[in-house]
């Protein structure tokens, strides 16, 4: 999903079984010790479902800001894009955990929302803004995309395409100069 080694320390490879089938996936831990799991074929959770909270590059007592995401792939995309961000990263892991999310957001004075650009994301955003009117919605950054990860993927694709075009132009110029 366009992620780089910057975020690997936030993940763990989890091995699990569904019936007789043995699988593995990247895992992102939640605050109850459960895991959100993703691989090419599977999206689910292991043990208890809950929100995930990661404290990045700061002393939580001094820095009370948080960024909020629906899923952990979007959170990892944010960390990829902003590796020096200082604050909390809260991942809902399911919109059904909205009330749990709102309860946890009471610990922060500065809230930044990066929720999906779909109906459930809109509902969550409106509910959080109703409870925390000072929260800031940042979905305009990726307004043409479903979520922050899709935005990152399209940005990376554009960079790769430009690089390939430059390489092709260089090769063509090299060939022409040899003639």
Summary of predicted features, one role per range:
Residues 1-2, 31, 81, 151:
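Generic structural signal for bulky hydrophobic/aromatic residues embedded
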Residues 14-104:
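Phosphate-handling DNA/RNA-contact segment within nucleic-acid enzymes
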Residues 7-26, 45-57, 128-160:
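Contiguous hydrophobic segments
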Residues 1-24, 164-179:
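TOPRIM metal-binding catalytic domain and adjacent DNA-binding surface shared by DnaG-type primases
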Residues 80-179:
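TOPRIM fold recognition
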């Amino acid at each position: 999903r366009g992620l780089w080694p910057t975020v690997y320390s936030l993940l763990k490879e989890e091995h699990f079984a569904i019936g007789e089938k043995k699988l593995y996936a990247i895992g992102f831990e939640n605050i109850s010790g459960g895991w959100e799991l993703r691989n090419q074929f599977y999206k689910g959770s292991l043990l208890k479902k809950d929100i995930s909270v990661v404290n990045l590059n700061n002393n939580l007592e001094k820095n009370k800001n948080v960024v909020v995401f629906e899923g952990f792939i979007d959170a990892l995309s944010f960390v990829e894009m902003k590796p020096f961000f200082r604050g909390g990263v809260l991942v809902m892991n399911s919109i059904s955990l909205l009330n749990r999310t709102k309860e946890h957001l009471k610990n922060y004075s500065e809230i930044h929302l990066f929720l999906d650009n779909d109906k459930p994301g809109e509902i969550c955003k409106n509910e959080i803004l109703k409870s925390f009117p000072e929260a800031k919605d940042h979905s305009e950054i990726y307004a043409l995309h479903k979520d922050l990860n899709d935005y990152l993927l399209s940005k990376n694709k554009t960079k790769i395409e430009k690089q390939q075009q430059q390489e092709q132009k260089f090769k063509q110029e090299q060939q022409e100069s040899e003639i």
